[in-house]
Design a protein with these regions (language model features):
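Core SAM-dependent methyltransferase catalytic element
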Residues: 323-353
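Conserved adenosyl
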Residues: 97-288, 335-338
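Conserved Class I S-adenosyl-L-methionine-dependent methyltransferase catalytic core
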Residues: 2-34, 38-44, 52-53, 58-176
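C-terminal alpha-helical "lid/dimerization" subdomain adjacent to the S-adenosyl-L-methionine
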Residues: 279-321
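Short beta-strand "wing" residues that participate in macromolecule-binding interfaces
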Residues: 76, 85, 278, 325-328
């Protein structure tokens, strides 16, 4: 029957995608490393020119472009001698924070070459864990600027993908002062300050990272309302005085014990009825299991610390730290980040809005 054949073909394609996914990711990585998408940004290009600029044999470039066309990164223009951006390629260029992340994935792919060794904790000389030096360090506050600059830059590049969603999901206009804990180079802090002209913001991170934040704040001309403070939030008190604290893509980097320790430090820094805003990818997000459970599940495993949690699991940690039941605030792209907001009191369940 025709409809049964269609179902069988659809399942066969899905199964093949599952088997060939690594090849797809490597085609994408090659396009990013060779800057193929940027080369096509201004319009169609001839294959011979692309091959020369990328220092590839022409036939190798054709192989890459055929693969990229199948993935909708590029598309042929009539004569098969010219190509232009495809729909997926244009979407990637429209989200510039994705390109550094794709290039960075080479470290993850190296660690996933033997997934069983990774799962057993037998991976030797992993690539990803050293990149995020603070994750396994006994003295993260001693990190130097050269060691924190790469990951701080990566987080900054991808922060733009989620920051506006967070600010749209929860208005900070009702608050007078924000403490952004684990705020990196100040990307979210400066965006929040621009979005809320009366808001004072403190960006808190490790000393070397805080120096990067100070430079960004100065470049943004926001020094009158935004400052950077430094310390180790797992071993030192947080700056007090703010009525709202944000943890943007922070908790999922840490195990439960460390997460509760951080949440208790946040609770101690907040006034009575102060507000905590949590934003990060969460497990159990409808339609986003491949993001939270596949991608972040294995990324954080290779990183050596943390896990994606469901809102209910986060609620348990919050209650253990003295917070009320949080409320989920809808975001435009929940696969990238969901937003939980809670207050300093006790509570029992996750509410949604």
């Amino acid at each position: 029957m025709p409809f049964l054949r269609q179902i069988a073909r659809r399942r066969a394609r899905s199964l093949f995608d599952l088997c060939a996914g690594f090849v797809y990711s490597q085609v994408l990585l090659a396009c990013v490393r060779l800057r193929i998408l940027e080369a096509l940004a201004s319009g169609p290009r001839q294959i011979t020119d692309l091959a020369r600029e990328a220092r590839l044999p022409e036939e190798a470039m054709r192989t890459l472009l055929r693969a990229a066309a199948a993935l909708q990164l590029v598309q042929w223009r009539g004569d098969a001698e010219h190509c232009r951006l495809g729909s997926q390629g244009a979407a990637l260029l429209g989200n510039p924070g994705l390109l550094p992340m794709i290039a960075h994935h080479a470290l993850l792919y190296a660690d996933l070459a033997d997934p069983v060794a990774l799962l057993r904790g037998e991976l030797r000389d992993g690539q990803l864990a050293p990149y995020w030096g603070y994750a396994g360090s006994d003295r993260p506050a001693a990190a130097t600027e050269p060691s924190v600059a790469p990951y701080s830059g990566l987080m900054s590049a991808s922060q733009g993908l989620v920051a506006q969603q967070i600010l749209a999901a929860y208005s900070l206009r009702r608050h007078r002062s924000l403490l952004d804990v684990g705020g990196g180079d100040g990307t979210f802090a400066t965006l929040a300050a621009r979005d809320n002209p009366s808001l004072h913001v403190t960006c808190f991170d490790l000393p070397a990272v805080a120096e990067l934040a100070r430079a960004r704040i100065a470049r943004a001309g926001l020094g009158a309302r935004v400052q950077a403070a430094s310390g180790d939030f797992l071993s030192q008190p947080l700056p007090a005085g703010s009525d709202v604290v944000s943890l943007i893509r922070v908790l999922h980097d840490h195990g439960d014990a460390q997460a509760v320790r951080l949440l208790r430090a946040v609770r101690a820094a907040l006034p009575a009825h102060g507000t905590l805003l949590i934003a990060e990818p969460m497990s159990g997000t409808p339609g986003a299991a491949r993001v939270s459970d596949v991608y972040f599940g294995f990324y954080l495993l290779a990183m050596g610390s943390g896990r994606a949690r469901t809102p209910t699991q986060l609620t348990r940690l919050l209650r253990a730290a003295g917070f009320a039941a949080p409320r989920l605030h809808a975001t435009a792209l929940p696969m990238a980040a969901r937003v939980l907001v809670t207050h300093c009191s006790t509570g029992r369940s996750v509410k949604t809005s």
